[in-house]
Amino acid sequence: MDPRSEKIFKAADYIKERLDGRVPVAGIVLGSGLGKFAEKIENPIVIHYKDIPGFPVSTAIGHKGNYIAGELGGKFVIAMQGRIHYYEGYPMDLVTLPIRAMKVLGISYLFVSNAAGGINFDYKVGDLMIIKDHINLLPNPLIGPNLDEFGPRFPDMTHPYDKKLIAKAKEIAAEAGIPLREGVYIAGTGPSYETPAEWHFFRTIGADAVGMSTVPEVIVARHSEIPVFGMSVITNAAQKEFAADYKNDGDDVVKAADAAADKMTYIFTKIIESL
């Protein structure tokens, strides 16, 4: 067996032992500032990344580094309270190991969330954006020998985000009076924030929001034909002109995401309830 697969199955076996034979219907990835989403999970089973054999550990601001398994929307789910980023120095097989492990656990759906910078001038801080498509500027996690037990060598990416889940989210948000955006997310390596020229370039090629994560997770999920729903919290607004004292700040990103967390939690919970 490929050493990467061995690591995935070893991690999954450790997690399985703590789930008492229960199979999660969905995996959820909680981005910067969205960790309190996990507080909504009932009868939680907490599994620390640092205790899982061969597992990477989150070092980013606002990422605690736990799996939380339990009940959400009447369904058994497993959530990542903190993700792994490429900019932390991990290779892509470790960045995506948590998603692969959840695949082995038996998830049928993947929900991903992130804090993202607004590129579209219409977007405001605190807006929720459904991710309808993405642009990847990170290394592709499928580079290297294919893991045949997870999917084909050349997976199709025509529909990276599930249209039925998107339609359900819009229906739920409309009923609750929660305004939603829908746009294209572009993922860069980070950890430096974007220059004004890069923001202009990203807007020119069709991106609406920018971040440093999510896309590798979506690629490996789709490699295994797992339906994906993605949502961004816009944590800073696009600037037509950058003031002399303008500055991106990680703490501000976390605060803005935290302020929108309840709305995102409601939408995710209601979708999961409907599965």
What annotation goes with each model-predicted range?
Residues 14, 18, 164, 168-179, ...:
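Generic non-transmembrane alpha-helical segments
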Residues 239-275:
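His/Asp/Glu-rich mid-to-C-terminal helical/loop segments that flank catalytic regions of hydrolases
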